[in-house]
Amino acid sequence: MSFTLYTNKNTRLQRSELAVPGSNYKMFEKALNSEADYIFLDLEDAVSPNDKSVARENIIKGLKEYDWKGHGKTMSVRINGLDTHYMYKDVIDLVTYSGKYIDTILIPKVGVRDDVYMVDCLLSQLEDEFNLEKKIGIECLIETALGMVNVDKIAQSSQRLEALHFGVADYAASLRARTVVIGGLNPDYPGDQWHHGLSKMVATCRAYGIRAIDGPYGDFNDPDGYINAAKRAAAIGYEGKWAIHPSQIK
């Protein structure tokens, strides 16, 4: 029997996580006044290529101008993928101009542990340059077949790593799985088609002391579907779930 136990690296309340497009500044105030525990301002999927620079500027401005902490929010930013030319500027500009307001960086489409190492190194250099007292945490989206196969190694990749998120939409695409609604169940499959991925990821998170967060449910006009998806995730140990619309926060 092994007596090795990994304690939780960083405890944060993350029951509900509201996704907010960085390109839509007027939504920032709505997020501020929402009931979400966690806010992630998005530079990736929710932002078109032509709006990447504007979204980055909006996020820097919004992090500094709004009293997120006073409203009890934990603040995260989803950067663009490491396979894009936007990523390095995302990290450098965010930390340079608003680093002290950021709690975590969310990395999309993490496939191998070296993806995390790259962002970790950038953060360390920037924190040292600007004498930031608080270290910025890292969260990873597991949303590809490669990421799921390597989830155990990814979970051990950095002392900054606080949470893994199950990115069901891109994960489904990576598997070529047939879906009806993002995060929903396909009636052609006799059971929960996401059970294996969800179970594997939450077990990994619990083993290494990091949080397990379920991703989006795509139809915000289907509250019952969202509630059922949230209950399924909670039943197997997930601590929280994304909301893509304030109406999904309970």
What are these regions (language model features)?
Residues 1-250:
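Expand to "…catalyze enediolate/carbanion chemistry for C-C bond making/breaking, isomerization
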